[in-house]
Every structure is written in C-alpha cells, then in structure tokens.
C-alpha cells in the first residue's frame, strides 16, 4: 500500500468501523506507516503464494480468486467486493470472487483507460459492477464519455475524505524554514504533473516578488533530477528549494503563502483539500478531473489553463499583491473542506448501508 489512493482508503475505512473490512493486496508492496494506521476492523489477507511480482498473468489472477473463494468468503454470510484500484488486474480479480455485490472505485482521469492496451478488458469487466464510484462530477462525465451514457445511473459520486484530525495534529509542528514561499507538494512524475509550467510561471514574476517568495517543491519521484535540472536551466535555481519527501507536508502547507498544483491530469487531488484544510490559498491547473469541483470554478481558489504559464504567473501575482482577495480565500478554505467531507460521509453511508 503506497500513495494517495491508499490514503483515501484509510480515510474511508476509518469512518465505517462497524463493518469488517478485508484488504486483498495484489502486489506485495506496502507503506508500513499506512498499515500501522489501519483501524481494528481492517485485516490484510496474506497471499504471498499468489501475489503478483512482475508481468500480469491471467492464470495468477484466477488462482488468487479461487483461493479467496475457497478460504475466505465462506466465513461471511454476506460478502461485498470493492475494487479500489484502477488497474486491470484488480478489476479482474474482483469480478472472479464470488460476492453478493460488486463495486469499483475510479480514482484516475477516465480518459487514461483509452490509452491502455487492456481497454477492451475494462469495457468487458466494468459491466459486472453494480455501481461505479466516481470521486467528482467531472470524473463522472468523463467516465460516461469513455464507456457510454448507460453508466450514468450506475455511478455514485463520493468525494475523497480529508483527514482533518490528522492535519490539525501535524500542521503546527515547528518548521525550520525562514523565508516566505510558494509551495507545490506532488510526486515528481512528468506524466501527470507539470512542474515545468510552475517554474516558468515563477520565472515571469516581478523581481521583487521572487526576492520575497521562494518556490518550494516537496516530494520525490522518478523525474526528480529532470525537474531539478530544468530549474537550474531556468536561471531561477537560487530561488527554488527542493526539500525531498517529507513525513509531514502539512506544516509546509500551513506556513506557505500560497499553494500551487500544476498538473496535466488528476482524479481527485486530495493535496488541494489538504492545503485548504490548513487555510492556505490554492491555485490549480484546470485539468480533468477534480480541481474545478473542489475549488468551485474560482469560488474557493483560482484556476488556470493547463500549461499556461502566463495565466498562472498573473494569478500568483494577484494573490501575492491583493490582500483583500488573498484574505477572502484564507477565510473560506477550511469551510470548503468541511463541506466536502460532509458530502463524502453521506455518500459513504449510502454505499455501505445498502
């Protein structure tokens, strides 16, 4: 278990402690810190013998499903299978397990399925699920574009929950960083994130703003060195800070002047919600999907066109220069996340009380 999807899962199961939840990991890669946070109602099904360690094998998936059917589900009167990943392997296994009810969560931009060599399999297996859970309205529209309008009535909208208690416990830790800064927290992956546009936008800020505000990147990933080199070539490296992966990103959000998410594609970027929860104003690329749904088309944060560094630079300048507009976004940030959480909990109850 690693990454944002697993964090979303943890937030959900922490709100359904009256249900027995079994996790079936397909690949044996865990984040030990997340495992330690699992509530008592959650257990991990050990499947070392059948777990996938490399190339997708249909036979492995069939054997794994048969193992679950013979050894696990007989212990329960009612068994609901929820696919909580966007990979074809987890979808196939979910459909092969015998259950009373089948659901599948969609975390990604649905157009990503079109680029998969397994797209024909997605089309076949998605038909078996009673409900598809999308994490915002924009994602639902995209899913129906890709797989057909017939899915519209099967789709349940469930926003991702933000763990406000955890954020509140961590955001006030002392941060040993003495300069004001603009922040982006993300995995260094150029396929979905757009660090270059943010660096270009920062370069276009007036000199006095760059002198006052550093640009800070929190995170790590396979493209870290490429992005760092781009920062060097931009001529702004002296104003840009790469912190690497941080155990507590919330104290960085709490102390940031503003938070920027520059992405090419998203599902439902929880990092925007986390920044808003610390009352940090947000600017995000208007990518599919999530940012527009969270920020309500500018009501709770500013949006810019994907890849448009001029627009981003102007909106950064606006927030850094206009105190009235800036303070308005500060005052409404937390309220928006509490509202989203309220919607999410209502949806979770609807899903799991069926």
What are these regions (language model features)?
Residues 245, 264:
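Aromatic "clamp/platform" in nucleotide-sugar-dependent glycosyltransferases that forms part
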Residues 82-89, 106:
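Short His-centered aromatic/hydrophobic patch
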Residues 91-93, 129-154, 162:
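A short, active-site helix/loop in glycosyltransferases that binds the activated sugar's phosphate group
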Residues 1-3, 7-11, 15, 19-59, ...:
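N-terminal strand-loop element at the rim of the active site
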Residues 3-11, 180, 184, 189-204, ...:
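A conserved mid-protein helix/loop that constitutes part of the nucleotide-sugar donor-binding site
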Residues 324-353:
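A charged, aromatic-enriched C-terminal amphipathic alpha-helix characteristic of glycosyltransferases
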Residues 281-285:
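Short hydrophobic beta-strand element within catalytic cores of glycosyltransferases
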Residues 296-298, 302-309, 318-323:
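Conserved acidic donor-binding segment of nucleotide-sugar-dependent glycosyltransferases
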């Amino acid at each position: 278990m690693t990454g944002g999807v697993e964090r979303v899962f943890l937030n959900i199961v922490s709100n359904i402690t009256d249900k027995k939840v079994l996790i079936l990991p397909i690949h044996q890669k865990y984040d030990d810190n997340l495992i330690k946070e699992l509530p008592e109602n959650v257990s991990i099904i050990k499947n070392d013998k059948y777990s996938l360690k490399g190339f997708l094998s249909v036979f492995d998936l069939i054997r794994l499903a048969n193992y679950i059917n013979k050894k696990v589900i007989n212990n329960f009167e009612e068994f609901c299978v929820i696919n909580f990943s966007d990979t074809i392997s987890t979808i196939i296994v979910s459909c092969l397990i015998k259950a009373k009810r089948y659901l599948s969560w969609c975390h990604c931009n649905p157009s990503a399925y079109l680029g998969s060599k397994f797209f024909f399999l997605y089309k076949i297996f998605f038909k078996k699920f009673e409900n598809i859970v999308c994490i915002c309205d924009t994602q639902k529209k995209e899913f129906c574009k890709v797989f057909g309008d017939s899915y519209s009535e099967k789709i349940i909208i469930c926003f991702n929950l933000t763990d406000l208690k955890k954020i509140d416990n961590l955001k006030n830790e002392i941060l040993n960083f003495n300069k004001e800064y603009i922040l982006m927290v993300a995995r260094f992956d150029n396929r979905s994130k757009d660090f270059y546009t943010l660096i270009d936008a920062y370069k276009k800020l007036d000199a006095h703003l760059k002198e006052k505000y550093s640009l800070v990147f929190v995170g790590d990933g396979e493209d870290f060195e490429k992005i760092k080199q781009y920062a060097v070539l931009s001529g702004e490296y002296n104003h840009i800070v790469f912190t690497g992966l941080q155990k507590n990103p919330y104290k960085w959000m709490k102390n940031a002047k503003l938070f920027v998410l520059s992405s090419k594609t998203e599902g439902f970027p929880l990092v925007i919600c986390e920044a808003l929860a610390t009352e940090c104003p947000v600017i995000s690329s208007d990518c599919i999907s999530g940012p527009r749904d969270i920020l309500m088309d500018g009501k709770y944060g500013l949006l810019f066109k994907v890849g448009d560094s001029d627009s981003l630079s102007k909106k950064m300048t606006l927030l850094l220069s206009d105190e009235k507009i800036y303070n308005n976004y500060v005052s409404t940030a937390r309220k928006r996340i509490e509202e989203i959480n309220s919607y999410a909990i209502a949806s979770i109850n609807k899903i799991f009380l069926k």
